Design a protein with these regions (language model features):
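Basic, often amphipathic N-terminal segments
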Residues: 1-92, 106-195, 201-231
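Acidic/polar active-site rim loop that often engages polyanionic ligands
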Residues: 93-97
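A short, structured beta-strand-centered segment in the mid-to-C-terminal lobe
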Residues: 101-102
Length: 231
């Protein structure tokens, strides 16, 4: 018996539509201009709403996809409408504040997360290492805060502790505080796809493993969104 199975760090997530993606890209561009060492939202750092992050056995990924698909069919995600309500500083990375757009939690999201946790438990493992993540020449290491965050995602970020959000970049704490205090007009939007992604450093959704578009219209929207990353 293998007591140290190969693991993959995954993120089951929602890809939002172009309305909120446009806002996320605008904020990210501003943050990058003021802090070039931050991360740019692109196809390797997509704007998304994380529902569940955890380690699963790599050999069970196909079973994970089937389990996620089963939950998708049981929830009315196709009619889901969400509201982005504010921009906040949500923790820090290397002494820089993390800027996120907060989404109002709704019952469907909470149910979706709860069912995902239950159905994926047989495939989950603890004590994941950097080998479970996507790395690159530009970002070759996985920091300890990422490893800790994913390890503790379920107790710290599920149920009553779940704060749906879209991470849009990082910036110095003092200047970010000024940005989050600016007026934020609420935005109504919908998800266009549900995906299982492999995580990169700092919880970025780096590599799509499996994706389900919500409708034919959503497929076209998703394609247009991905084109917008390279503009």
């Amino acid at each position: 018996m293998n007591n140290n199975p190969e693991l993959t760090a995954i993120d089951v997530l929602l890809t939002p539509d172009e309305i909120i993606v446009k806002k996320a890209l605008e904020i990210n561009k501003q943050l990058m201009e003021e802090y070039p060492n931050g991360f740019k939202l692109d196809e390797s750092h997509i704007p998304h709403i994380s529902i569940l992050q955890n380690y699963v056995r790599t050999k069970d990924l196909e079973k994970v996809y089937k389990a996620v698909e089963k939950v998708i069919t049981s929830e009315n995600i196709t009619s889901l409408q969400l509201k982005a309500v504010k921009l906040i500083c949500n923790g820090s990375i290397d002494e820089q504040g993390v800027a996120v757009i907060v989404i109002s939690p709704v019952e469907i999201l909470l149910n979706f997360q709860s069912k995902l946790i239950d159905i994926l438990k047989p495939f989950m493992e603890n004590n994941g290492t950097a080998a479970a993540y996507v790395t690159s020449e530009d970002d070759p290491n996985i920091n300890d805060s990422t490893l800790e965050y994913i390890e503790n995602f379920i107790p710290d970020h599920s149920g009553s502790n779940f704060i749906p959000h879209i991470t849009v970049g990082i910036k110095g704490m003092e200047s970010l505080e000024k940005l989050v205090n600016e007026p934020f007009t609420p935005i109504i939007f919908s998800p266009v796809s549900i995906g299982v992604y492999q995580l990169g450093n700092n919880g970025t959704a780096s590599r799509v493993l499996k994706e389900w578009t919500i409708s034919r219209t959503s497929q076209r929207i998703l394609e247009n969104i991905k084109k917008s990353y390279i503009k």
